[in-house]
Amino acid sequence: MSGRWSVRPRSAGRRGRPWLVLRGRDREAVLWNGPVLELHRRALARVGPDVLADPPDLDRMVANVRREPAGRELGEALLDQRLVAGIGNTWRCEALWQARLSPWRPLGETADAELRAALEAAAALMRGSLAGRRSRNAVYRRAGRACPRCGATIRSRGQGDANRIAYWCPGCQV
């Protein structure tokens, strides 16, 4: 990628003409001398609410997930960016472990409070990582090792059409 990024307080003045500015509440990321930039608004319209929004729209996220078939697996739904934007494979596995939920559980057998707990865990884990407080993974890429909570052997296998590898503890994630 060409160009140079800087992150600064929003109140800081800028000299020159930036190529791209991404504004947060207190800070902004500025790209100088960037490459060709194309915005695809139609693609953005299909993306669900951002798990890192401040605050995240948990009600809308839960409502989006609830529109899915009851037999769809929770772990697969959390990776669907149309439902909830931002959760990747690592955060899916770790959030479900924190919430004690199996990635294989059907959505129809998952209570709203459980779904919210998984979404809140994902948001907290991701925010912590952005702030430099990333803790050691409990299950992600730890197949065959002992679960740090219950001692059962962590398992892994592909899930969904994309066959993304799910890591989970069969002892404490139900």
Where are these regions (language model features)?
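Structured catalytic/nucleic-acid-binding cores of DNA maintenance enzymes
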Residues: 1-174
